[in-house]
């Protein structure tokens, strides 16, 4: 079972439906016991960093102890960072060293919304069957700054920013696989296969 952690954000139905489409059994939950027993965990997207991290901190001992694959989507990926500057400066989970910052005005329209391409920067099982140049769907005003060693894909929006990161059992995407058509479903299927191992 894959636990989709409910920390008060939107988009829970679309990610659970997409995972079910690729054969996963899912449970949307904030119950620490269910999360502890899951074979994979998803931190979904769409919401504010501050309120999400406050809710996660209530079950921090449980999520810090997880050794199963964890997928962070959009806000979920940003929560992996050391800190975020969204609405102030807030400590993140610090699973992937980095800082979440707002796009500079020089990029043009913020939020970055719509389809954009991936540039794969290193091999990663989560991206099996996905090629550079394929389109995925974004909705965000903030992005993670992190070392290249953790970056598996980048995307250009006036600046090159990390659109995919990976460290140990933590995998994060700034885009929404559940809204990214066949490419997104392939990525979610890869995650399910990683979880099954």
UniProtKB/Swiss-Prot annotation:
- Outline the extent of the Glutamine amidotransferase type-1 domain: 1-197
Q: Keywords in UniProt for this one?
A: Amino-acid biosynthesis, Cytoplasm, Glutamine amidotransferase, Histidine biosynthesis, Hydrolase, Lyase
Q: Name one Pfam family in it.
A: GATase
Q: Please tell me whether the keyword Cell inner membrane is annotated for this protein.
A: no
Catalytic activity field:
5-[(5-phospho-1-deoxy-D-ribulos-1-ylimino)methylamino]-1-(5-phospho-beta-D-ribosyl)imidazole-4-carboxamide + L-glutamine = D-erythro-1-(imidazol-4-yl)glycerol 3-phosphate + 5-amino-1-(5-phospho-beta-D-ribosyl)imidazole-4-carboxamide + L-glutamate + H(+); L-glutamine + H2O = L-glutamate + NH4(+)
Location comes to:
Cytoplasm
Pathways per UniProt: Amino-acid biosynthesis; L-histidine biosynthesis; L-histidine from 5-phospho-alpha-D-ribose 1-diphosphate: step 5/9
Quick check: keyword Signal in the entry?
no
Tell me the function of this protein.
IGPS catalyzes the conversion of PRFAR and glutamine to IGP, AICAR and glutamate. The HisH subunit catalyzes the hydrolysis of glutamine to glutamate and ammonia as part of the synthesis of IGP and AICAR. The resulting ammonia molecule is channeled to the active site of HisF.
PANTHER family for the chain? IMIDAZOLE GLYCEROL PHOSPHATE SYNTHASE SUBUNIT HISH
Q: What is this protein called?
A: Imidazole glycerol phosphate synthase subunit HisH
Species of origin reads: Archaeoglobus fulgidus (strain ATCC 49558 / DSM 4304 / JCM 9628 / NBRC 100126 / VC-16)
């Amino acid at each position: 079972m894959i636990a989709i952690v409910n920390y008060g954000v939107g988009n829970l139905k679309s990610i659970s439906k997409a995972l079910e489409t690729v054969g996963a059994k899912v449970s949307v939950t904030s119950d620490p016991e269910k999360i502890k027993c899951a074979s994979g965990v998803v931190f979904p997207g769409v919401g504010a960093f501050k309120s999400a991290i406050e809710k996660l901190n209530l079950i921090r001992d449980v999520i810090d102890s997880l050794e199963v694959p964890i997928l962070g989507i959009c806000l979920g990926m940003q929560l992996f960072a050391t800190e975020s500057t969204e609405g102030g400066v807030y400590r993140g989970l610090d699973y992937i060293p980095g800082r979440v910052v707002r796009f500079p005005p020089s990029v043009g329209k913020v939020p970055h919304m719509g389809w954009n391409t991936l540039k794969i920067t290193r091999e990663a099982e989560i991206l099996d069957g996905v090629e550079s140049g394929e389109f995925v769907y974004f909705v965000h005003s903030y992005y993670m700054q992190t070392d290249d060693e953790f970056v598996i894909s980048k995307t250009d929006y006036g600046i090159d920013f990390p659109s995919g990161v990976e460290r140990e059992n933590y995998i994060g995407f700034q885009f929404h696989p559940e809204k990214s058509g066949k490419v997104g479903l392939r990525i979610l299927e890869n995650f399910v296969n990683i979880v099954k191992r």
